Amino acid sequence: MQDLSGSFVALVTPMFENGDIDYVSLKNLIDWHFHSGTDGIVSVGTTGESATINFNDHHDVLKETLNIINGRMIAVAGTGANSTEEAKDLSLEAERIGYKYSLSVTPYYNKPTQKGLIEHYEYITGKSEISQILYNVPSRTACDMEPSTVGKLSENPKIIGIKEA
């Protein structure tokens, strides 16, 4: 497994006023981060508008980001969603495109129990091979993953880390 240490940036998804993705700005932004010494990019995470763009745009931005990075930095796909099925589908799509790592925020709005969180992540990892990084951001999701839940999930070899915000 690749070393996931260093500076990782949760990249914004640049858009035009009409909501279309600005791929020229995406390339410029990624190139700037590469030349500035950034070690890894998280594409279409919560900072990248994952909750507001459609599945096709999500796919296209993930794919284009990986093409632009072209092995120069570590690429992490934002695959979190409120729906477990959608998070699974995004994880499978990221894996198909060529990502090795995904960042998956806890489901928001529905406020799952700790048991529900375990079931959510176990379901996703049971359906895909991509390595998952848990993302706990209770101030945004109204759901706080407890240390005991993280401990239980850490027993899963496909869950390789956590982003705590």
List each language-model region with its residue ranges.
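Active-site beta->alpha loop and helix N-cap motifs at the rims of alpha/beta catalytic domains
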Residues: 1-9, 13-144, 150
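Catalytic beta/alpha-barrel core
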Residues: 102, 157-165
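Acidic-histidine catalytic/liganding microenvironments
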Residues: 72, 156-157
